């Protein structure tokens, strides 16, 4: 009899949970329509892969790319709608979150065609690769709109788990396995530190988990200037620093970049930074509103360390991917300037604008590396010597992307950095901007060193890799070249395109 009653109670509880979930999805689901499109694409991929004996690879790519493009379209149609807090306060939709979601979708859309030829040549499993990419994209999108501590923790874990699986996708590669283990262990440690910081924030606010309610809770408990908040700030900064590859939490980055498949590195190098930057901006700006001086100081120190260490160590690298790893550490230091400046002096607009340009510059560079690696099998910087004599198109594309990363005019990277540094200067961050300018000059040195190798390699310096290089004709169906051309064009757009981009970015208020 007791068992029968308990069983009935369990059924009733399960029914209530199901009805509540159905109610939330029915009334709030329209606000996450772009995410629902990706979920539908994931289910469709799984169904086709499970039921079909013959793997129609072009069809898998088509479904993935179409899902991403449709999600972007749905996101654009939702632009300028009223901000909404949905799913019982777990998720928020506004222009600020949606522009970061757009950037993540743009990254994934460009990364899929960049991966096609690489996966075919390495004989990697295509379905799982696309599933991990779409799931990571979904996790990044939910992180951008996360409005409570639980979602802010669960969403990046979804992204991180897919990142671990993608970085170790070439199971027979010893370097890939080593990189995955380091990434997994350090990622787990950083997540633990982040959760510990959240627990201090949760306790200090009187048990609140929503970001805005945490602020109200801190006011009610009079704990907004307590040591507990400073401890929470310290732990959360360390956890976010790992996600952003900020020094000194950057040790995993070079090994993961070098050991992972190159298309995976291209994907992780941009999407992780976009999602983590969106989350960091909201975490620091809302719950730590009363500790703005403290987190400004912390981020300034981390930004200076990242810009100096990243660019100085990049000079000594012999691997293209390791060089880009240290370069990305320096680049995220520039992005931090926009987060510190905030919305009052156009900091968020400059950060978003620079991130848009960084996506095109970085993915364009990685597209060139993927193409060169497939044709030569090497990643060493010295092996690029004299590439211009064999493949002028690839050499010029790589040179333009590197010059844009360095911030030379009249390329997009120059105007992005100029606007970012100008906003920092207006906000009074004179020392931070000066360090940024100095390290930008240092970065130009190692980028120009590579370009000199590309263009002026003498016959005796040309390695067998380039000497035996066979340039395939430019084909309309070469997806890597398609991604490369799109990124190169976006990286070389002059300042004439800046005004509309900045105008759109300035609308991204909370």
Curated annotation (Swiss-Prot):
Subcellular location as annotated: Plastid, Chloroplast thylakoid membrane
Superkingdom of the organism of origin: Eukaryota
Transmembrane segment boundaries: 24-44, 57-77, 99-119, 124-144, 149-169, 183-203, 227-247, 295-315, 323-343, 354-374, 395-415, 428-448, 484-504
Protein's GO biological process: ATP synthesis coupled electron transport; photosynthesis, light reaction
Matches recorded under Pfam families: Ndh2_N, Proton_antipo_M
UniProt-recorded Gene Ontology molecular function terms: NADH dehydrogenase (ubiquinone) activity; quinone binding
Keyword field contains Isomerase: no
Major place of residence: plastid
GO cellular component terms given for this protein: chloroplast thylakoid membrane
Protein's organism: Eucalyptus globulus subsp. globulus (Tasmanian blue gum)
Protein name listed in UniProt: NAD(P)H-quinone oxidoreductase subunit 2 A, chloroplastic
């Amino acid at each position: 009899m007791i068992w029968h009653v308990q069983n009935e109670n369990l059924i009733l509880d399960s029914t209530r949970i199901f009805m509540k979930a159905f109610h939330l999805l029915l009334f709030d689901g329209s606000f996450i329509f772009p995410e629902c499109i990706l979920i539908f694409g994931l289910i469709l991929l799984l169904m086709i892969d499970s039921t079909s004996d013959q793997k129609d690879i072009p069809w898998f790519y088509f479904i993935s790319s179409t899902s991403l493009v449709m999600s972007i379209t749905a996101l654009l149609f939702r632009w300028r709608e009223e901000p909404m807090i949905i799913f019982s306060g777990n998720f928020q939709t506004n222009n600020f979150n949606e522009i970061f979601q757009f950037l993540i979708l743009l990254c994934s859309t460009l990364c899929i065609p960049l991966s096609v030829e690489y996966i075919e040549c390495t004989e990697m499993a295509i379905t799982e690769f696309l599933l991990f990419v779409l799931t990571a994209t979904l996790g990044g999108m939910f992180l951008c709109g996360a409005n409570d501590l639980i979602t802010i923790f669960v969403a990046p874990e979804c992204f991180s788990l897919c990142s671990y699986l993608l970085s170790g996708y070439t199971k027979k590669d010893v370097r890939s396995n080593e990189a995955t283990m380091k990434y997994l262990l350090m990622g787990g440690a950083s997540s633990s530190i982040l959760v510990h910081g959240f627990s201090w924030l949760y306790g200090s606010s009187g048990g609140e988990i929503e970001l805005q309610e945490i602020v109200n809770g801190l006011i009610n408990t009079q704990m907004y200037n307590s040591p507990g908040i400073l401890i929470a700030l310290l732990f959360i900064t360390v956890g976010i620093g790992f996600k952003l590859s900020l020094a000194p939490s950057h040790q995993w980055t070079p090994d993961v970049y070098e050991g992972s498949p190159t298309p995976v590195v291209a994907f992780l190098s941009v999407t992780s930074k976009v999602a983590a930057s969106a989350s960091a901006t909201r975490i620091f700006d809302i719950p730590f509103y009363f500790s703005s001086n403290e987190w400004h100081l912390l981020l300034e120190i981390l930004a200076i360390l990242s810009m100096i260490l990243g660019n100085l160590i990049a000079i000594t690298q012999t691997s293209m991917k390791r060089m880009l790893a240290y370069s990305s550490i320096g680049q995220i230091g520039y992005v931090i300037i926009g987060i510190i400046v905030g919305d009052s002096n156009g900091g968020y607009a400059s950060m978003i604008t620079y991130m848009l340009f960084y996506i095109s510059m970085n993915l364009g560079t990685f597209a060139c590396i993927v193409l060169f690696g497939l044709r030569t099998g090497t990643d060493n910087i010295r092996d690029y010597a004299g590439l211009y004599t064999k493949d002028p198109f690839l050499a010029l594309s790589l040179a333009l992307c590197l010059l844009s990363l360095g911030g030379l005019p009249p390329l997009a990277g120059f105007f992005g950095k100029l606007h970012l540094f100008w906003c920092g200067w207006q906000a009074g961050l004179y020392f931070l901007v000066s360090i940024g300018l100095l390290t930008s000059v240092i970065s130009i040195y190692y980028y120009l060193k590579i370009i000199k190798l590309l263009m002026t390699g003498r016959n005796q310096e040309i390695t067998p890799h380039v000497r035996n290089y066979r340039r395939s004709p430019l084909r309309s169906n070469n997806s890597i070249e398609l991604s490369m051309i799109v990124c190169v064009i976006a990286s070389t757009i002059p300042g004439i395109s800046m005004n509309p981009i900045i105008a759109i970015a300035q609308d991204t208020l909370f």
